[in-house]
Amino acid sequence: MARRALTTTAAAFATTAALLLTACGGGGDSSSDDIKGAGNSSGSPSASASPSAGSEVKRPVIKLPSSFQLTFENWTSSDPVEQAVLNDGKEQLRAGYEAIIENDPESKDRAFYDTKNGFLQSQQWIRTYTDKNLTVIGKLPVFDPKVILSKDKAAASLSYCTDESKASTRNRKTGEVKGNPAGTDPEVLYVISMGKNAQGVWQAVSARSERGGCAK
């Protein structure tokens, strides 16, 4: 899949999809190129234990309701560093949808998996739902992951695709359910720049997205 340069702005989350957010990336490829923008990172830990991603730090337990099924296809790598990126990238995405469903733009779980600047971007995306009293329902597959590591393996680019064809938003007050407008490409490519913090957690530094980018 060809991946051209994408604009790195918080508005990308709000404008590329009428519906949902995910990312597009990472299976097994690595690169010697440095990953721009994914340097040292920081985050605030949550209180509970969590899925293992290759370190001893306690990660938050992310809980999603049965009304929203977020599935990850082929989310494995034989490289342990790439697998750690995949694991934390997966939980970062799950934490974002948890924040939307719980109507919580200040989500500590999401903040755990973001740098400070990354969390500001995440909050803008989350508020595109919470400010409109929207939650998410349905099924959202996440697939075609790809990880590219920097030379020192302290930064990475995680890309992946999502298919929004069976996912919808629901208004918390009226109950109105909406999917994407007719004719909208349901697949969205996401590219997440990530950095490894002092605790060994891979955090999102910034995100880029392109609707229809998965077919390129």
Tell where the protein language model's regions lie, with residue ranges.
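Bacterial N-terminal signal peptides that target proteins for export
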Residues: 1-13
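Active-site-proximal loop/hinge segments that shape catalytic or ion-binding/gating pockets
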Residues: 17
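C-terminal motif of bacterial Sec signal peptides marking the signal peptidase cleavage site
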Residues: 20-23
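Bacterial signal peptide processing site
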Residues: 25-28
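Post-signal peptide N-terminal segment of mature Sec-exported envelope proteins
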Residues: 34-60
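Core segments of small alpha/beta cavity-forming domains
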Residues: 62-135
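Structured, amphipathic secondary-structure segments that form assembly/contact surfaces
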Residues: 105-216
